[in-house]
């Protein structure tokens, strides 16, 4: 049995568990997959969050991807991260970097089992700030500098768009020059991303260019984001499959469990940790059972590249009203859909950075 | 890997049982490893017994074919090179 078949049928616990700790954010990025900006009033309390971490430790979850919103806006952020690590659950947290001061940088650098990803969506303020908000590039860069001064090998996560594609080399040089590692991930039409999808998604020419660029830069991480591009030739590094409900899931700030961080929609909600245990939801939810038995069907099954891309990303299909058995809307064999101009006006504007809440 | 070697899991590696055997995760380099069911008794032996002794027992009980042992020891050697297990000295 191939690793694809083994993983498709689900595991005792997720490999990659995303915990969106809060929807509060001091930025308002135009492509935010969770439409973050405002704290949910019924967010999990510190005690509920700790009980969840206890459960994950019992399930031997190796690590969690912590995101949001901006996780550092939670007053109990450091407490919960230390609680997690003390239970041997490694933490990879995503931050916009605005709240990383020298004290936080020292804490990050001195904590084992902790990885940090700073979100940067362009190699210049002009490109980044149009998506993430005025001043966000310089604040993210400051966070990178502080971590570099502590000798900490931070990561930069870059959601590549048609506006930033030409800056990949520049961003790679900037990040690696500071001792960091670049991670490039796929834009999804999730959350507010739906409103800017047509304006920011890569052109087919850029998608082909990205495949070649990733092949030429094996040091660049992708979080298995671009498995739809593996149809172009030799597979990209990673499992090259949709892990939703199989090896991946997402817990939102209210404790709702979704199949993956990119499908925060009722159709993909498996349960809530306030109603039943996370372990029960993971192993018994009808939604997850269905996903584990399902494979993309339709015309993909007769495609020679099926074994490398497995039909692409479920979230991209869902939010573009594409049937799940159809090819990925960005299938490399599909004709270009929509304009190819690099700069198309955005229908949303990011908000300037809000003041940081007191710690 | 010699049959007289004893192996133990690296301190920074966590092991989780799965239907196919186990998943191993290294906190040191953030790598994930798939451990086949047949390999698990070796990886999880905590250095208590020689790998040849474990293999003989599995062969005797019919859980392993003698012909499969050299290949398993090669895979185990691969895990040693990647720092997942160490030979106990």
Predicted regions and their residues:
Chain B
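Long, low-complexity, charged/polar intrinsically disordered regions in eukaryotic proteins
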Residues: 1-30
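Long, charge-rich, low-complexity alpha-helical segments
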Residues: 28-89
């Amino acid at each position: 049995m191939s690793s694809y078949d083994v993983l498709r049928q689900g595991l005792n616990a997720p490999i990659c568990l995303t915990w969106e700790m809060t929807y509060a954010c001091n930025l308002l990025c135009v492509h935010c997959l969770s439409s973050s900006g405002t704290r949910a009033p019924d967010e999990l309390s510190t005690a509920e969050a700790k009980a969840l971490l206890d459960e994950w430790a019992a399930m031997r979850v190796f690590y969690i991807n912590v995101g949001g919103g901006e996780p550092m806006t939670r007053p109990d952020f450091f407490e919960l991260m230390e609680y997690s690590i003390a239970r041997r659950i490694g933490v990879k947290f995503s931050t916009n970097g605005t709240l990383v001061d020298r004290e936080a940088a020292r804490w990050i650098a001195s904590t084992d089992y902790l990885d940090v990803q700073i979100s940067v969506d362009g190699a210049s303020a002009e490109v980044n700030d149009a998506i993430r908000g005025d001043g966000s590039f310089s604040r993210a860069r400051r966070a990178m500098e502080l971590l570099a001064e502590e000798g900490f090998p931070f990561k930069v996560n870059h959601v590549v768009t048609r506006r930033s594609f030409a800056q990949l080399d520049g961003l790679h040089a900037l990040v690696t020059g500071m001792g960091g590692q670049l991670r490039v991930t796929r834009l999804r039409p999730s959350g507010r991303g739906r409103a800017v999808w047509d304006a920011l998604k890569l052109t087919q020419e850029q998608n082909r260019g990205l495949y070649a660029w990733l092949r030429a830069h094996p040091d660049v991480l992708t979080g298995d984001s671009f498995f739809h591009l593996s149809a172009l030739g030799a597979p990209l590094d990673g499992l090259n499959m949709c892990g939703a409900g199989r090896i991946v899931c997402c817990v939102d700030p209210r404790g709702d469990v979704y199949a993956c961080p990119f499908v925060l929609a009722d159709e993909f909600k498996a349960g809530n940790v306030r109603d039943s245990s996370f372990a029960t939801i993971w192993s018994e939810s009808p939604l997850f059972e269905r996903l584990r038995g399902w494979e993309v069907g339709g015309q993909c099954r007769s495609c020679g590249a099926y074994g490398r891309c497995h039909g692409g990303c479920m979230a991209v299909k869902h939010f573009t009203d594409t049937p799940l058995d159809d090819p990925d809307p960005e299938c490399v064999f599909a004709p270009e859909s929509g304009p190819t101009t690099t700069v198309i006006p955005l229908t949303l504007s990011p908000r300037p950075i809000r003041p940081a809440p007191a710690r | 890997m010699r049959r007289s070697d004893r192996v133990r899991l690296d301190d920074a590696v966590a092991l989780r049982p799965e239907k196919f055997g186990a998943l191993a995760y290294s906190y040191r380099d953030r790598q994930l490893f798939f451990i086949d069911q047949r390999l698990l008794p070796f990886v999880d032996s905590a250095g208590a017994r020689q790998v040849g002794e474990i293999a003989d027992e599995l062969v005797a009980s019919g859980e392993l074919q003698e012909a499969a042992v050299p290949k398993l020891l090669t895979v185990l050697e691969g895990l040693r090179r990647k720092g997942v297990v160490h030979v106990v000295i």
